[in-house]
Amino acid sequence: GALDGGCHFKGKLVRFGYIELAEKHSNFLPPNEKIKAHEFHYYDSTDNGADCIATKPATGRSYDCVISHDNYWLGFPHLYYPSNPHFAESFVRKAYEYRRNKNGKLL
């Protein structure tokens, strides 16, 4: 597949609930900023990524997640974009840059 690891049905909810995500290395978010999200899925991966730290606000429990690099940000969390508009701005900017660099011209 496109990513390392495998994905498997677990038969129950995995990492269910609200979280806040912080990038370990600023890529889509400015340094020290977070974005809110939630997770509710029945599948799990053998490689959930380690480029972000997810923290449950209610308990403080945290875990690694998300596979991120220059122009992609992949993972199970469902992001709440209004909680940090910088993320959406970065996403659009990176998509624009990718398209420009891929084709060598703007459309």
Tell where the protein language model's regions lie, with residue ranges:
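Hydrophobic, well-ordered secondary-structure elements that form the walls
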Residues: 3, 40, 78
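Catalytic beta-strand/loop cores that center a nucleophilic Ser/Cys/Thr
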Residues: 23-69
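Hydrophobic alpha-helical scaffolding
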Residues: 8-11, 30, 77, 81
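Electropositive phosphate-/nucleotide-binding environments in soluble metabolic enzymes
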Residues: 15, 34, 81-85
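Cysteine-nucleophile active-site neighborhood
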Residues: 1-27
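Short conserved micro-motifs at the rims of enzyme active sites and ligand-binding pockets
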Residues: 12-14, 49-51, 85-88
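Acyltransferase
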Residues: 71-107
